[in-house]
Structure formats: structure tokens, C-alpha cells
Amino acid sequence: MKLGIVGLPNVGKSTLFNSLTKAGALSANYPFATIDPNIGIVSVPDERIVKLGELYHTKKVTPATIEFVDIAGLVKGASKGEGLGNQFLANIREVDAIVHVVRCFEDTNIIHVDGSIDPARDIETINLELIFSDIEILDRRIAKIAKQARMDKTLAKELELVEAVKAHLEDGKMARSFEVPDDEDAQIWFKGYNLLTAKPTIYAANVAEDDLADDGASNPHVAKVREMAAEEGAKVFVICAQIEQELAELSEEEKKEYLDDLGVESSGLDKLVAASYSILGLISFLTAGEDECRAWTIKKGTKAPQAAGKIHTDFERGFIKAEVVNYQDLLDCGAYSVAREKGLVRLEGKDYVVQDGDVILFRFN
């Protein structure tokens, strides 16, 4: 999973990236501190594999991972090449989902490119640039197929779709709210355009420390972000990038104490992971043994052979059966052999849909 972190200059984007990845990316109080996208691989916090590791006395515990890309700050006019616009738009096309950091804190020491704090304006600035970029892509497609569409029914059908999506964008709406016809061709065409505004989006409302305890409930800027996200089907989570940066330097025990003192249940990374898995429809299954306990990320609805293929393509090709036990059942039993004796280990075939928290042993030829 690859997430692109975007936002206007000086909203806390690189500070958040630094704290999530501990990568120490250059973070400065001026536009375009991030010129090339910084990339960081982050472990997905999951206590299940830690506990499985203890149960199996395993040599190695391997969590699932998320790749974060810190993409250069964006300004008005990026779709026409202003600032670092073209580079920004090329980088963002490669990600699975967008994490849009929005400034919801007041601080006279940190300049805002537009001189004031206004999340609605900031969101619209970036969204409009993404829309303009998508319209340009659709215009290029229209120019390519319009002439041939007069004599080709399939291209005529695609042209109708492209023009409908373009009209939707010209109304200021994101492509992800466009209702694609329930038709296989239309679905394939729409996906093939790889539109920026079709990508799932998570808004990170970056607040001051005082707004964390009530999850931004008393912050009018956060309320506006939530309202706009609801209209476009996006997720929102509240974060204080400055606090996340401090947490990144602490041990797990110190982190817990610090969060308790703040009156906060989970870190920003935990919130972001939960939002990412939710908006992308992802789950994790687990494999366990003395050599390694590991979490694997798959789409909800994935069947056993395809899940096996995440481990190795040979597992999918030669799939025979999957031995499956629920993580909590295995933990309660204290040993795989006990879970088997109690009839909690099931033998599943190729049509089995893998569930979150399944501990699986694949049998393959």
C-alpha cells in the first residue's frame, strides 16, 4: 500500500511524514522544503503478531507495511506548472490513496501561504488543481478518440463516458463521487484514466496539542474539514504533527504514558492506519511458526488461493487447501495443537473468503 502525503506549504505535512517514518526529511518554514518525494516504509502496528510471536517463541516478527510518499508542497496554479506543480501531479498519480494534511491550528510563527487559516479554502485549492489536471487528461482522451468514435460504436460509448466524467469535474466535483455505469467496459475505462480525484482521500486535520483530547470537537476548523469530507465521501482523522514528532523519539512504554497524560487513546499513526485500511477496504491475515510470524495485507473479499499468492506465486498456482484458525481462538487455546483438538482449526478450499485475523497454513502442491 502506497499513501501520498500532500498539502499546501507550511501545513505540517513534512513534520507528519518525519514523525511517521522517522526519516528526518528536511522540514523548513518556507514553501517547497520538500522538492523530491521522500519515501518511507512504516510498520503497521499490530499487537496480534507480537502475541503470536510470543506464543510460538518465534525468531522473527514481520508486520505489514505502508509506504508513505511525502510529495512536494502544492500551490494555486500547479496544474499549469506553477511552483512544483507538474512534478507534484506526476508523483501523486502513483499512490493508492491520498493523505491530505490540512492546517487547523493558529501559530503566528509559522507563515501560511495565503496569510490566514482557512481549511475550506486550502482544501478547495488543492482539489481544484487535481480537478484541472484530471480534465486535461480527459481532454487528451477526447481528442484522441473523437474522430474515430463516429464510426466505432465502442469508442462512441467510451466518448460518452469521458464527456460525462468531464462534465462532473467541471461542476467542481471529485471523480470518486461520479457514478460509473454498471458496465464492465465503463468500469475498465474509468479505472484506466487513473484520475487523481478518483483516489480515496483521507484528511489529516493538523491541530494544536490542546485540541487532541476532544478529537478536535471544539475546533471550528476541524468541523469544517469534517463537513467537506462528508460531502465527498472522504475520511478524516485529527492529529497533532508536532506531538507525533515527539512521540517518534519515545519508547513504546513512554509513548503510552505520554498519550495517557494528553488524554488520547491512540497515536496519529494508529489512526491513519485504521483510516487507510478502512477507505481502501483492506484486512490482514497472519502466518505463524517458529521461524517467523507475519501479517499480510489483502483486500476484503480475497479468496484463499489469492491470499496464498501474496506469500508466493507458487502457493497460489499449486493451492490445495488452507488450514484456518481465528487469531483469538488460537491465543485462547495457547497452542495450535490444542486449537486443533477442540475442532477450531478448519480446512478451507479455494472458495473460502479470508477474514481479518485468520491465522492460515497453506497446503500447496
Language-model regions, residue ranges each:
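Amphipathic alpha-helical transducer elements in NTP-driven molecular machines
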Residues: F32, D46-I49, T62-F68, E82-D96, ...
